[in-house]
A protein has these predicted regions:
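Short linear sequence motif anchored by a di-proline
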Residues: 1-150
Length: 150
């Protein structure tokens, strides 16, 4: 499960990797992207063209937003995503790709401590995470969840 990731590439590097123009969209580097943070993402428009947009991490289905106790859903398990009411519609119609430099996975070390491990490509180039998205409730933000596997 991905709970933090790094998005630290320059606008030029992201533009080149995505074959897209990001001019005017500069989010800056983040070495600790956490849920609700804004990051670059790519989606396909109805016309078939790709669009680079700013996405907010954490999908919040309408029925979840009415409860202050429930957190946005940051991950969706690929094995069951099409069966879960929170994700099924987004999985069918609204997919995205999120570029990242790497992500953190925590491993339990000893009795109570957990150690973060940074996972990245050997050549330090961008990696791409599959995601699903929905329009945020009450605003125009595009909320996303990262697809994970077991």
């Amino acid at each position: 499960m991905c709970g933090r990731f790094v998005s630290a590439s320059s606008e030029a590097d992201v533009s080149q990797a995505l074959f897209a123009d990001l001019s005017g969209v500069n989010l800056g580097a983040s070495y600790n992207v956490s849920p609700t943070a804004s990051v670059y993402g790519v989606r396909t428009l109805a016309s078939g063209q790709r669009s680079v947009d700013v996405f907010r991490w954490g999908l919040a289905p309408e029925w979840i937003s009415h409860s202050k106790k429930l957190q946005p859903l940051i991950n969706a398990r690929l094995e069951t995503v099409d069966q879960k009411p929170a994700f099924a519609n987004a999985f069918k119609f609204r997919r995205c790709v999120i570029p990242a430099n790497g992500f953190f996975e925590w491993q339990k070390m000893g009795s109570a401590n957990r150690q973060p491990f940074y996972v990245y490509k050997k050549d330090s180039s961008l990696l791409f995470m599959a995601g699903i998205w929905e329009l945020g409730v009450g605003d125009e933000a595009k909320d996303f969840s990262i697809l994970t596997t077991r």
